[in-house]
């Protein structure tokens, strides 16, 4: 590649990276711009192996710009493309509405607040996708705060912290701050003391059932009028671990006759005998409830906008009492409905998935049958495809259904151009098992294209001298013909395929089936799918690929290569991506 060509590639890559970043309001990806770059400049294609290294610094530079800088630079390089994009934007109904009162804040600062009791299922990705997209739209800040202050009921999983950060990275975002609530217990104690001094909290030793009866009747418990000094003393005893679980709580003094019983004198702190799994927090026994901890952190960490489930409307109302005591402004709130995901037999529940893994019914969090972010990544689905599908759900208060087909469609657009084609013949009862036949006459090898839309990439050479295997369901009756894709027309005679040399146009007119095949001595491969594992035989060229490469098994679908065997005695493994 000479310097002149390198400069042309660099300039074209910058235009495409800017266009991609501005259009999607996100960072550009090398893979996402390769297709348009090659499509608009066919002369670049012979340098396909070198181009990613040339354009990577360009993409990195574009990603270092803010939204306004990208638009200005695109206007310099390709004003007509920016005009087309703006015309599209004017006619587009953005699924994400503008944030309320965003213009009143110097910096829009939003958070995801996961409970790290396990890696994320697919539904969890929605919050990160939307918060990350708003961050990009407003050039704001993204906080990941682990709300890990329940060491017993929703006990944190130590592996989940990194797993969740990996999931956010997979989706294409990087938090500006990562905070563990369990590192901030002393801060919660400090504000509890201030609240007590303001008359906003009292210690209570009522049995839970007894207090519930009083609360539901709008009656105060005997401890409600306790003075601040006594409350402070008993709270310090809580902090020192002098009470057992259930023996003493600290309540926020609200309105005991409030029309909504859920808002009446709710618990701010309780005693927990189970130590926290994090060594840095294992000494604490007095733990804040989520509404107190989360509300406090939203203010102290400068959160301007909160997105939460419609079922958590009472949380904002409870937290408002605390905010009123401290004379704080409550953040802007968007409530949305729950998301349900189709296609999976496994519940969209962290605890349910964990139980299935523990029972051995799932191999792990990245099992293709699990509705998890880790599973999507291992299957070869790009995070951008997930984000785009989540964004299309909007922020309605109604419950929404996520069709996996929308993720698949997005991902197909991202990977199709770059995915070479390959043959894989499934040895399963569902497809009639494997059938082996010798080829009589004809060429020694088939030569299907690596990609039907990009002939310049070349062809795959698949030998037939050892015979071929096809799926039993594709085997024609004796005397009938089939077209072995990339090889030619054969007639099924006795126990062989006799090469006929018929022209493809004649075959099409007569309705002859076109099928995939593999050499009888091709490498063994196991395809892991949502319906279970399928073994079979692949074409030998598969050994030339690397782990993480995505190919399209013709007539089956896309698959990510998870393990590429380099000898005939070892089975390769691939994960089915989608049709």
Swiss-Prot record:
Subcellular location: Cytoplasm
Gene3D superfamilies xref list: 2.40.240.100, HUPs, Ribosomal Protein L25, Chain P
Enzyme class: ligase
Motif window: 'HIGH' region: 114-124
Pfam families assigned to the protein according to its UniProt record, in alphabetical order: tRNA-synt_1c (PF00749), tRNA-synt_1c_C (PF03950), tRNA-synt_1c_C2 (PF20974)
Enzymatic reactions: tRNA(Glu) + L-glutamate + ATP = L-glutamyl-tRNA(Glu) + AMP + diphosphate
Biological process terms in GO annotation: amide biosynthetic process; glutamyl-tRNA aminoacylation
UniProt entry keywords in alphabetical sequence: Aminoacyl-tRNA synthetase, ATP-binding, Cytoplasm, Ligase, Nucleotide-binding, Protein biosynthesis
Keyword Thylakoid (UniProt): no
Entry's Gene Ontology molecular function annotations: ATP binding; glutamate-tRNA ligase activity; zinc ion binding
GO cellular component: cytosol
EC nos: 6.1.1.17
Family: Belongs to the class-I aminoacyl-tRNA synthetase family. Glutamate--tRNA ligase type 2 subfamily.
Function comment: Catalyzes the attachment of glutamate to tRNA(Glu) in a two-step reaction: glutamate is first activated by ATP to form Glu-AMP and then transferred to the acceptor end of tRNA(Glu).
Protein name stated in the entry: Glutamate--tRNA ligase
Organism for this UniProt entry: Haloarcula marismortui (strain ATCC 43049 / DSM 3752 / JCM 8966 / VKM B-1809)
Gene: gltX
């Amino acid at each position: 590649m000479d310097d002149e060509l390198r400069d042309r590639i660099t300039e074209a890559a910058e235009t495409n990276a800017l266009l991609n970043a501005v259009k999607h309001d996100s960072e550009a990806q090398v893979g996402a711009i390769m297709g348009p770059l090659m499509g608009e400049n066919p002369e670049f294609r012979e340098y396909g192996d070198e181009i990613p290294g040339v354009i990577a610094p360009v993409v990195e530079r574009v990603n270092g710009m803010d939204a306004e800088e990208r638009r200005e630079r695109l206007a310099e390089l390709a004003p007509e493309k920016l005009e087309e994009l703006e015309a599209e934007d004017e006619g587009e109904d953005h699924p994400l509405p503008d944030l309320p009162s965003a213009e009143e804040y110097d910096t829009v600062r939003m958070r995801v607040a996961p409970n790290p009791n396990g890696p994320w299922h697919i539904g969890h990705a929605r919050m990160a996708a939307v918060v990350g997209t708003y961050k990009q739209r407003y050039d704001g800040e993204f906080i990941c705060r682990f709300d890990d202050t329940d060491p017993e009921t929703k006990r944190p999983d130590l592996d989940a912290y990194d797993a969740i950060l990996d999931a956010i990275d997979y989706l294409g975002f990087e938090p500006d701050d990562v905070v563990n609530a369990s590192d901030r217990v002393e801060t919660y104690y400090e504000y509890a003391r201030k609240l007590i001094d303001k008359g906003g909290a009292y210690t209570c030793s009522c049995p839970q059932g007894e207090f519930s009866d009083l609360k539901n009747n709008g009656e105060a418990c005997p401890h409600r009028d306790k003075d601040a000094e006594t409350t402070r003393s008993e709270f310090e005893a809580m902090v020192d671990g002098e009470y057992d679980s259930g023996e003493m709580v600290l309540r926020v003094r609200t309105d005991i006759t409030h029309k909504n019983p859920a808002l009446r004198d709710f618990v701010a702190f309780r005693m927990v005998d189970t130590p926290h799994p994090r060594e840095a927090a294992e000494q604490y026994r007095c733990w804040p409830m989520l509404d107190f901890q989360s509300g406090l952190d939203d203010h102290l960490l400068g959160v301007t906008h909160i997105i939460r489930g419609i079922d958590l409307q009472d949380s904002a109302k409870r937290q408002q009492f605390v905010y009123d005591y401290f004379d704080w402004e409550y953040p802007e709130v968007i409530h949305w409905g729950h998301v349900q995901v189709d296609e999976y037999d496994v519940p969209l529940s962290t605890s349910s998935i964990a139980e299935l893994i523990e029972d051995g019914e799932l191999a792990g969090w990245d099992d293709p049958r699990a509705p998890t972010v880790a599973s999507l990544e291992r299957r070869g689905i790009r995070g951008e495809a997930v984000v785009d599908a989540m964004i299309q759900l909007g922020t309605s208060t109604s419950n929404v259904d996520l069709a996996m087909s929308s993720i698949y469609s997005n991902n197909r657009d991202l990977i199709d151009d770059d995915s070479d084609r390959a043959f894989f013949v499934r040895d399963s009862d569902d497809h009639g098992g494997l059938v082996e036949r010798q080829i009589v006459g004809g060429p020694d090898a088939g030569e299907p294209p690596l990609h039907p839309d990009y002939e310049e990439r070349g062809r795959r050479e698949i030998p037939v001298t050892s015979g071929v295997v096809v799926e039993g369901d594709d085997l024609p009756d004796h005397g009938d013909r089939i077209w072995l894709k990339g090889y030619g027309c054969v007639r099924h005679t006795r126990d062989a395929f006799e090469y006929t040399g018929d022209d493809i146009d004649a075959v099409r007119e007569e309705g002859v089936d076109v099928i995939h095949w593999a050499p009888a001595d091709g490498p063994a491969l196991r395809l892991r799918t949502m319906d279970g594992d399928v073994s079979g035989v692949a074409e030998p060229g598969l050994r030339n690929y690397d782990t993480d490469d995505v190919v399209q098994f013709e007539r089956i679908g896309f698959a990510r290569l998870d393990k590429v065997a380099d000898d005939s005695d070892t089975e390769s493994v691939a994960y089915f991506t989608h049709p």
